[in-house]
Regions:
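A cross-family phosphate/adenosyl-ligand binding-site feature
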Residues: 1-70
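Short glycine-rich anion-binding loops that position phosphate/pyrophosphate groups of nucleotides
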Residues: 61-62, 87-90, 165, 241
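Alpha-helix C-terminal capping segments
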Residues: 69-76, 104-115
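Structural motif
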Residues: 80-81
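Redox-cofactor binding/interface segments in oxidoreductases and associated redox assembly factors
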Residues: 84
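Charged helix-capping and loop-helix junction motifs
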Residues: 97-104
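Class I SAM-dependent methyltransferase SAM-binding "motif I" and its flanking Rossmann-like core
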Residues: 112-126
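Electrostatically charged, flexible surface regions
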Residues: 131-256
């Protein structure tokens, strides 16, 4: 298990070039009824009683965690499957998938020649009852086992979105395609204030219009990932690890 040591949302498949990554280690605690567990962190694996249950924390991106995990933190045999997640928040439709660190980490595995799965929990309310999380996890394990045993030879990675609903334990998995949606600016200009910190300079604060993304799903049709989740099903999208080209556009380009 290799994970970032801080929040790394919206970072895609980036690596922080020029940065030397530093590892620390934790031992995960027992599964309880809550979400928060703050274990002690160790700088060296030997002081944490390092074994199969120890987790490596890296001050890098999700994709970097995958790469380090594949080549420097593996056990006695090569890794045969990368599982990235679960992420608390949906990674469906083009708007979210392209920016997703969770999907980016799975993509890194696929680009290393390893089968990969990205797992995300899609919720409408952040107050998720712990039993729903447990049921979603159980359902996800069942689905991942199925995909592993029935892997499509053309697929390099799957991205899964599980709706965090009361009936998640029986939610049906459905193969989907990505909804190709767009939106406007993801920033708001900070106006009307001048402080010594900004010295009157123009500033822009992160503030995507998530409602606009939701509208693209509501207005869409067909078996896309966004609609399937809204219908209470689990979206399973098989992917190749590339930016898809347009095969019908070919030939020499003549410039006047």
């Amino acid at each position: 298990m290799v994970i970032p040591n801080t929040q790394k949302s919206w970072i895609g498949k980036a690596h922080l070039i020029g940065q030397t990554l530093t590892a620390s280690y934790i031992r995960p605690g027992p599964v309880g009824d809550g979400f928060i567990y703050d274990p002690p962190t160790y700088e060296h694996p030997d002081t944490s009683g390092y074994d199969e249950s120890a987790w490596m924390l890296l001050d890098g991106t999700p994709a970097s965690c995958t790469n380090i995990g594949l080549y420097y933190n593996r056990r006695k045999k090569p890794v045969d499957l990368v599982i990235s997640g679960p992420n608390y928040g949906r990674n469906s439709t083009a708007l979210y998938i392209i920016s997703s660190g969770t999907v980016g980490a799975a993509m890194e595995g696929a680009l290393s020649g390893v089968k990969a799965i990205s797992l995300s929990y899609a919720f409408e309310n952040r107050s998720i009852p712990p039993p729903h999380v447990k049921e979603a996890t159980t359902r996800s394990v069942e689905l991942i086992k199925y995909l592993w045993e029935n892997w499509d030879e053309q697929t390099q990675l799957y991205t899964i979105n599980v709706p965090m609903i009361a009936s998640v334990a029986s939610a049906e998995p459905v193969f989907t395609h990505i909804l190709e949606n767009t939106w406007g600016s993801v920033f708001h200009e900070v106006g009307g204030s001048k402080t010594p910190a900004d010295d009157g300079k123009r500033q822009f604060r992160w503030g995507p219009d998530f409602d606009a993304a939701d509208r693209t799903v509501a207005e869409s049709s067909g078996n896309n990932d966004g609609r399937v989740i809204e219908q209470g099903c689990i979206s399973v999208t098989p992917l190749r690890a590339n930016y898809k080209d347009i095969p019908t556009i070919q030939g020499e380009i003549t410039l006047d």
